[in-house]
């Protein structure tokens, strides 16, 4: 790893955000194999790219970014898709559920996360200008359900540029409004 395990006394965790790519809850690169190393050295056996990458991480955030493959799926199917993603041992967090635009059973999924010791992410990008009010309201419902059922959350900026790192003011405000 490029970063040390600790830096100025703070333990650094290495993570990756990975797309859920189908209704079975599989993560990106679950089906991509390779059998050569970086220097064209032949490996003893083929490796699965997704497992190889996630094996170097402390955790993964499983998220939806493209949902065309879920067109016509039922609420039950979408809920099960997320549950299946949680079966991946690398997945610790389900990412930005409020803006996925997919209909799932919020209490059922929150209970599943709670019971498995997994987290649900809330991030600032969902609150950015141009995001639909429905996504922000959906985040509120998810956060309230997490509070009611005792599911832990993670929150952050979802920064895609250095100037946005640690900017989570709208998420913090929304969470503070939930008692």
Can you name each region flagged by the protein language model?
Residues 76-93, 97-179:
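Charged catalytic cores and adjacent phosphate/nucleic-acid-binding surfaces used
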